[in-house]
Amino acid sequence: MNIFDHYRQRYEAAKDEEFTLQEFLAICKQDRSAYANAAERLLMAIGEPVMVDTALEPRLSRLFSNRVIGRYPAFEEFYGMEEAIEQIVSYLKHAAQGLEEKKQILYLLGPVGGGKSSLAERLKSLMQRVPIYVLSANGERSPVNDHPLCLFNPQEDAQILEKEYNVPRRYLGTIMSPWAAKRLHEFGGDISKFRVVKVWPSVLEQIAIAKTEPGDENNQDISALVGKVDIRKLENHAQNDPDAYGYSGALCRANQGIMEFVEMFKAPIKVLHPLLTATQEGNYNGTEGISALPFNGIILAHSNESEWVQFRNNKNNEAFLDRVYIVKVPYCLRISEEMKIYEKLLNHSELSHAPCAPGTLETLARFSILSRLKEPENSSIYSKMRVYDGESLKDTDPKAKSYQEYRDYAGVDEGMNGLSTRFAFKILSRVFNFDHVEVAANPVHLFYVLEQQIEREQFPQELAERYLEFLKGYLIPKYAEFIGKEIQTAYLESYSEYGQNIFDRYVTYADFWIQDQEYRDPDTGQLFDRESLNAELEKIEKPAGISNPKDFRNEIVNFVLRARANNNGRNPNWTSYEKLRTVIEKKMFSNTEELLPVISFNAKTSTDEQKKHDDFVDRMMEKGYTRKQVRLLCEWYLRVRKSS
């Protein structure tokens, strides 16, 4: 199918369909979406969640306490926002059941650049997936999306409708608009003359979806919400005639759908008054002497915390406060999820194929998240950041607390302050374009750009010092360690085999040492007594600064014996035990004198050295670095190493 046929097919599928009122009632009998409220239709569009048993994945089990959680495919690109999404779905479920939430404003509260607008856009987009049914008369569709059931009286007609068409009583009671009431009189009370149109909500055409923004204090009035008289029609109609009214307000257009109010609490208070009755009573007054207008939809508002605090502290606004269902949308606090946000943003730009050195996005994510975290008590903020990402630190940091302990101490406002994803992405843009020749990103340029930006932003001195401490006290040393390991692993071709040999040898020596037995090497025939074994073990332990060798050796041998039982008697992989892995890596790379000629970009004295250097560069490029980045990062690493 070519693009033109594909477009036409889509256009035809979205065309209006017209039915008689009798046909519509027959549809109600078979399809409950024909009379479902806005929250129910939005839930249909969101769909069922994919249930995830977090007990099966160690990282998730630490974050979600082994609970079974639901993940909604409709929100799969909203990373680290499970809690906010769950609250939104909870609001919709309760509203769909006709509970108090149906009468409340769904209010997304969060810091700038935290994803509130993106969530609102996704909800509006989902609203377009399920059609609505609207009254029509004389070929003209109701300007306020009157639902056909508004024609019926709950006291008089509910029993018949429930018995014959399976329409529950609670779906009756929405008032008729002045437009529908006028047509009813014109038809002499004959409701069969009405038609019903099946319409697809549309952001583009503002059908059942509308958006309003705060205007100037002096010139914005409630007509932005409720509409006003259309002076062009006064030539043919009286001022209080429903046909003289311009139903252009956001509440008029959003009936049966969703109305988004951007930065709601920046609007003058007089503009917000129609929302009180629209939410609680399902109707509101227009600006002229016409009868009340119906509203049976969702009001979605969002703003930053400062506006909300100011609004909440004003005693005159108490009527509103009780009608607001708050969903907090904080910044992402998990490194892995923050990285996915950057990847998503990059994929929607020209930089999607630009080289990005390993560690760049992770380093930026670490910096962003450190800025958002509250300082913990009796523990390191760096450990807290890692625990928030689902890491287990029981082997590396005995002071680290559990995820829940950190959350409880930080309180509900954690993640509502700090550097935004928007700020981080602007940093990333500058890093990619830092080099005038190569469009690529690497952590060394990232450090430079971040330091510059911290100075330019003119943060309060204490905050600027805190950010610089994150950079110089943690991120730069951490990255120096990472790139050192990258360089060293690229240098050692048989890295994995070499590491496994050291591991196996260490375990054997430790086992014989613990049992106080001599050991004869099967390959060389060399005999090791307990003292010789101890000397060999210390060669591996000393570079890592093991303070209590006896306990360490017992711990390792016990771990390996347990692992062998589940591994057909074979030793586990040398990387499987974090403590020993660190020890082996430090032993492997304690002597780097022979490493320097290979990784430096100086002129080589022999073809053998040149070949080793070229092989090293090729292996680094296989890891995801460009040739230029290999040189830059090696030179940076050697400088940092020398200065420390």
Where are these regions (language model features)?
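Long, basic/Gly/Ser/Thr-rich N-terminal segments
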Residues: 1-40
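Conserved ASCE/P-loop NTPase catalytic core
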Residues: 33-644
